[in-house]
Amino acid sequence: IVSIMDSVRILKTDISVTNINEVSEVLINEKKIYTAICNANTLVRCYKDENLNKIINSFSIKCPDGFPVAKASKILYKNNQERVDGYKLFLETIKAGLNKKTTHYFYGNNELTTKKMIEKLEKLYPGINILGYYCPPFLDSEQLLEREHVDDLLDKKPDIIWVSLG
């Protein structure tokens, strides 16, 4: 996986210099783009955990979610970085993908929240193409990747897999 955008280093993490529209367009038009939504908590956790930092830094896009991250980018690197709000990015990408019939799969969260979210998305965006979802119980990282759930996800071949585990 290669970073596809310019980035700046904040603490130990490389944060993409981007905006909501640019990220949404990449997510809709490119395949296998790993994207992290990074707020201040993410950066602190990455600073303390070298393995987590290595994983996040390997992603193609690391969005500056949260005012402190965007502001740090502006101050430290004299750029015009704006906040790339994860929720707004999610909605913009859903909306932008309607014309292209982009398919979505949701992984994480809990059953009740996910069903309510899907219901709301179907009202807001008629024609949204949701292939499925899986809400794992609290498990260790190896259990999260149990073969049956991975196979289900791979069989459906969604264009975008939205992951919410934290």
Where are these regions (language model features)?
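Generic short amphipathic/hydrophobic targeting helices enriched at N-termini
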Residues: 1-4, 156
